[in-house]
Amino acid sequence: MLTGIFKVLKFIFKLIEGLGRLILVCLLLVFIGMIAGASSHKTVSAPSEHYALVIHPHGQLVEQLSESPLSLSEVASSNDGPQETLVKDLVAAINQAKKDTHVALLVIDASDLDRSGLTKVKTLVAAIEDFKTSGKKVYAYARNATQEQYYLLASADQLMLDPTGELELVGIASYQLYFHEALDRLGVDINVFKVGTHKSYPEPFIRQDMSREDREQRVKLLEPIWADYQQGIEKARKLPAGAVDKFIKGTVEGLKSLKGDDAQWVLQNKLVNVLGTQQDFEAQLIKEVGEDKNSHSFHQLDAADYV
């Protein structure tokens, strides 16, 4: 009887071992298939007619993805978690489009660009400026634009703003929370030992406002950054020095004179070329590259599908 039991157990163990090997082989084949599929992946073929290449960053511009590496198209289509777009992917698309005879022009869509840092946006702008040396034009449209989005949009040869739109140009600032009063009410004693004047780290614990010394060092840090931003905009829009500052400081009075028309105030200060709707923008580009019979929009290819 024991012999029979051992035979059954031996059979079961061999069966389990065989299934394990089969699963391992299947996984290996799947892995090989994935590698083969990735290596055989080809760039989306460009249509024979001329078209516009659309630069449409989603989420933050980054130098390296924070999670598992995805293609630019996967990043653009993903709705899970914060979105990111690799700067190098967009730069590569722009550089390739410069030499591509099928690409007639560039279109910038900054509507989904999140706060990324001026340095990364400037990298993208530099690639766009280089693209323009080919003689090809760059177009952009905005319903509304944040300060960072506008820095990207301003590099366009032709920038259209929606008649109901506005630009968020307010400068840059640095804020600090102070909770000395709250700590006092909670009966928390704070003891700080410091040497010198410009020691701002403990100030939130011992003050209710910003010290003169802390304000001085923050201003010294922010002024060059803001000056660099203004110079970039004024160069891109071919405006005189101080034009951005003049726009911001004159906004209250300017809007009063225009009965609150933000878009007209932006146009009056030459921060955009023209006002128009999305339909107006598409109609203009249809004249440039023709109409796609399926979408009834202009012939276009997104950078996510281009590279």
Where on the chain are the PLM-derived regions?
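Small-residue-centered hinge/linker elements
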Residues: 2-254, 286-307
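Short, hydrophobic alpha-helical packing/hinge segments within bilobed ligand-binding/sensory domains
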Residues: 149, 262-263
